[in-house]
């Protein structure tokens, strides 16, 4: 992997703690950072984002090698971590700061995301429409250090939250098998 060959992908899918591991464990992924994007304030804090006044959503930004793990595959992984029919948050996490969004960094990513969303909608997998927003990537602000790699640092808390939030059951019911 050379720095020149790396690209960025940014996804919001509810609590960012739950979004890191599915990407971090894939080949060709250099790093996954938890943070905030899509709002109107500069350098927001977790507390500010949770207040609902910043316009930001919790998100992850992935640095990846598209020759090893193409953007299309990242989008597939993304869908399988979310409830794409719920625009008002994800699982127990409600509100604008947990809204699902695919943030595209270029026109190719936009086209891939839009086609993937249309295909998922047409597939009939869900009875409700696919409402995940597709939006142009804006400034991404890394979250506080204690949020980074949460699944590694706080394994028991992370695993418990996956279950308690309803995310694990939803993924099992809608995406497995």
Swiss-Prot record:
One Pfam family from the record: PMSR
Q: Which InterPro entries match?
A: Met_Sox_Rdtase_MsrA_dom, Met_Sox_Rdtase_MsrA_sf
For the protein in the UniProt heading, the enzyme class is: oxidoreductase
Q: Name one GO molecular function term.
A: peptide-methionine (S)-S-oxide reductase activity
The protein's Enzyme Commission number: 1.8.4.11
Please give the catalytic activity noted in the UniProt record.
L-methionyl-[protein] + [thioredoxin]-disulfide + H2O = L-methionyl-(S)-S-oxide-[protein] + [thioredoxin]-dithiol; [thioredoxin]-disulfide + L-methionine + H2O = L-methionine (S)-S-oxide + [thioredoxin]-dithiol
The annotated active site, in chain numbering, is: 15
- Which keywords accompany this UniProt record? Oxidoreductase
Entry's Gene Ontology BP terms: protein modification process
- Job description of the protein: Has an important function as a repair enzyme for proteins that have been inactivated by oxidation. Catalyzes the reversible oxidation-reduction of methionine sulfoxide in proteins to methionine.
UniProt record similarity statement:
Belongs to the MsrA Met sulfoxide reductase family.
Give the protein name, as stated in the record.
Peptide methionine sulfoxide reductase MsrA
State the taxonomy lineage.
Bacteria, Bacillati, Bacillota, Bacilli, Bacillales
